[in-house]
Amino acid sequence: MDLMQDLRRTCYCGEVTKAGETVVVGGFVQKVRNLGNLIFIDLRDRTGIVQLAFNDQTDRAIFEKAASCHSEYVLMAKGVVAERSSVNKEMKTGAFEVLVDDLRV
């Protein structure tokens, strides 16, 4: 378990809508999709869901921490908002994802 004291939420999951912005979000893991070299985590809070993304550019320790996450884990994640290559029109934040560079479980 990581200390989360030095991370402060900058926006809620359902409010992630500005590409290029650095954000800190927190919430519960809704779903984890591990595709080997890519991991996607749907993080939810009271406002909605945002997708967290981990790829080959992600720090190895953070990538491995993401791979160990399961449903209902509580996370804080810091990263840069990016436009998603495949938009999910059923989600309010479906056009964006957070490219994570700091993850606390």
Feature annotation, model-predicted:
Residues 1-105:
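OB-fold and OB-like single-stranded nucleic-acid-recognition modules
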